[in-house]
Regions:
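Catalytic histidine neighborhood in serine/cysteine hydrolases
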Residues: 198-214
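An N-terminal hydrophobic leader/cap segment in hydrolases
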Residues: 1-26, 30-40, 135, 239-258
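Gly/Ala-rich beta-loop-alpha elbow adjacent to hydrolase catalytic centers
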Residues: 131-140
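Acidic catalytic loop of the alpha/beta-hydrolase fold
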Residues: 160-161, 183-188, 213-214
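Serine-hydrolase catalytic machinery in alpha/beta-hydrolase-like enzymes
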Residues: 23-25, 30-38, 44-122
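Short alpha-helix in the alpha/beta-hydrolase fold that links the catalytic acid
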Residues: 165-167, 188-198, 220
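Short beta-strand/loop motif that positions the catalytic acidic residue
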Residues: 173-174, 178-181, 185
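Catalytic histidine-centered segment of alpha/beta-hydrolase-like enzymes
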Residues: 211-223
């Protein structure tokens, strides 16, 4: 369904974008499926390479925060959003080859996504940042400290797989790192997160009052998206809450709800 005129942006609002199905080829020979969402009528000013939550607990490229970022940020903030399924993960887009490997061989998946963004020419994908959620934050910390990446935004970081050596690597890189930590998170809450991330002097830990690990609720979605935009494209926030133009209302798809860890 579509309509013209100013409308409130809601959970199921899909704003205009140029959407392209993509495939990533890993160094160990796997094909991963994904999507690149671009601003509808101009080149992007920044790029998010997204890393989804734990696939064994329902995480995939369509986990709701990542999907809503792709629905809104290209049109509202001229930000490109790259989403993909890590090895062995399935979504309506398809299934990536391989099998889940407990954050070990997933290093090849992260590298393939970063390389895709780095070499893109039509259009160039500038100002590249990692956006990880839960398990995806571990992948960002472990494998995302790449010369072509400006920094990282971490949503609900559990620090389950990433170790002190990975935090040290980010500390010595000097790259900005922002961790958005729900007040009521199931795994790592703001106070403990501040202690853990003190190993990275430039890290900024933002506690979000009332939020939980899955960020359910439109107010939390808007808070997350505003923090993302403030980090990668300062001055473009706060995002509008209405859209004066064509919109599409998405239909719920099986299995696209909030993920686990």
């Amino acid at each position: 369904m579509s309509a013209a005129g100013a409308r409130e942006i809601r959970a199921n609002t899909v704003l205009p974008a140029r959407r392209r199905d993509i495939e990533l080829l890993t160094a160990d020979g796997l094909r991963l499926v994904g999507e690149l969402a671009l601003p509808p009528d101009r080149d992007p000013v920044a790029t998010l390479v997204t890393l989804h939550p734990l696939p064994t607990h329902g995480g995939f490229m369509d986990s709701h925060l990542l999907k809503k970022a792709s629905y809104r940020l290209p049109a509202l903030a001229d930000i490109a959003v790259l989403r993909f399924n890590t090895r062995g993960t399935t979504s309506p887009r398809g299934t990536s080859e391989g099998a889940f490997h407990d954050a070990r061989d997933e290093r090849f998946d992260v590298a393939a996504a970063i390389e895709f963004a780095r070499v893109a020419v039509d259009p160039v994908l500038p100002n590249r940042w990692l956006l990880g959620w839960s398990f995806g934050t571990d992948l960002a910390l472990m494998y995302g400290n790449d010369p072509s990446i400006k920094g990282a935004i971490l949503l609900s970081p559990p620090l389950k797989f990433a170790g002190p050596e990975h935090l040290h690597g980010w500390a010595t890189s000097g790259k900005p790192l922002v961790a958005l930590v729900p007040e009521l998170d199931d795994y790592l809450r703001p106070g403990e997160a501040a202690q853990q991330f003190s190993a990275i002097p430039q890290a900024r830990v933002v506690g979000v009052e009332g939020a939980r690990h899955l960020w359910v609720g439109e107010s939390y979605v808007r808070r997350v998206l505003d923090e993302i935009v403030a980090t990668v494209s300062p001055g473009a926030e706060p995002l509008p809450t209405t859209w004066d133009g064509e919109v599409v209302l998405s239909l719920p798809e099986p299995g696209t709800g909030p993920p686990g860890l």
